[in-house]
Amino acid sequence: MTNIRKSHPLTKIINNSFIDLPTPSNISAWWNFGSLLGICLILQILTGLFLAMHYTSDTTTAFSSVTHICRDVNYGWIIRYMHANGASMFFICLFLHVGRGLYYGSYMFPETWNIGIILLFTVMATAFMGYVLPWGQMSFWGATVITNLLSAIPYIGTNLVEWIWGGFSVDKATLTRFFAFHFILPFIISALAAVHLLFLHETGSNNPSGIPSNSDKIPFHPYYTIKDILGALLLTLTLMILVLFSPDLLGDPDNYTPANPLNTPPHIKPEWYFLFAYAILRSIPNKLGGVLALISSILILAIIPLLHTSKQRSMMFRPLSQCLFWLLVADLLTLTWIGGQPVEYPYIAIGQLASILYFTILLILMPMTSIIENNLLKW
């Protein structure tokens, strides 16, 4: 009798995806982040579900319902902080996952890469709307500032913003719809993640060398299941240290003040994981220009496969490209720092230089360096 694991329609899918999947024998710890993102997503859906049982999406009670969760609900505080800091872990894993893709040339699988970009946008939208829900000062003003950016769109901008708000300002209608979207989007993300995996399994995984590994594959289980479990344990450890020792480390103190439309906080800034994009937005004095630069900073990932001029897929054996890659990482860290600083000298100038450098590295320096490396190979 055939093993039910390989014959039953449901278990066959699981078997071919997570058990008997032929996997390159040399993939490193950088390949762990896909599974870690899956774990983060499950954690966020579960903690979010329990939070939604006690949360009320009304402007008069939203802030106090979050306080109620932390004070009165059994273990409500840990659920709330696991959800808030789980989002930070999610983005850390996301950035490392995308960075891995850039470094090792995983973008040469166009379908997988493009679905990944859509996933990135969807997760960013979900996180933004989630940040609005506690209805603190930074929630309210963050929502006001970011949604207002759409008014930069010619002709329809103002109408579009008021349509999203459901009125003439961020109010009850806005909060209710943001809660509805924040609830539904993670399930859309789950579906997209399944499609992401589907396309990945059409081609098989890339590996650090960037060389086809069809001649040297090993089963996913037990080799990579045990490796993923180790990654999951380290992720859980990091998250729980954050939650139990310094849960507010990555949050904003202003969000412990209830939303007040009559009082603007001195420095409006988003959560840390959006600061790099926020710095790029602020570095351009023109509103529409800033919005276009903001969108381009993420959408630029979509044209990375077109800019690949190297004869090698991975950066493993390309030292000049490696230097540029780490310069890009340093530049993004600089942008993250600048995004959290007030709009004054010298931060404005540093932000503008870092923004120019970001686009220059990706659009000009990396393709040119690859051509130089190709010529060096001829020597």
Curated annotation (Swiss-Prot):
Binding site for heme b b566: H97, H196
Localization (cell): Mitochondrion inner membrane
Transmembrane segments: 33-53, 77-98, 113-133, 178-198, 226-246, 288-308, 320-340, 347-367
Amino-acid positions noted as binding a ubiquinone in the UniProt annotation, renumbered to this chain: H201
Subunit structure: The cytochrome bc1 complex contains 11 subunits: 3 respiratory subunits (MT-CYB, CYC1 and UQCRFS1), 2 core proteins (UQCRC1 and UQCRC2) and 6 low-molecular weight proteins (UQCRH/QCR6, UQCRB/QCR7, UQCRQ/QCR8, UQCR10/QCR9, UQCR11/QCR10 and a cleavage product of UQCRFS1). This cytochrome bc1 complex then forms a dimer.
PANTHER family: CYTOCHROME B
Extra remark beyond the main annotation: Heme 1 (or BL or b562) is low-potential and absorbs at about 562 nm, and heme 2 (or BH or b566) is high-potential and absorbs at about 566 nm.
Protein name, entry field: Cytochrome b
Organism field: Arctonyx collaris
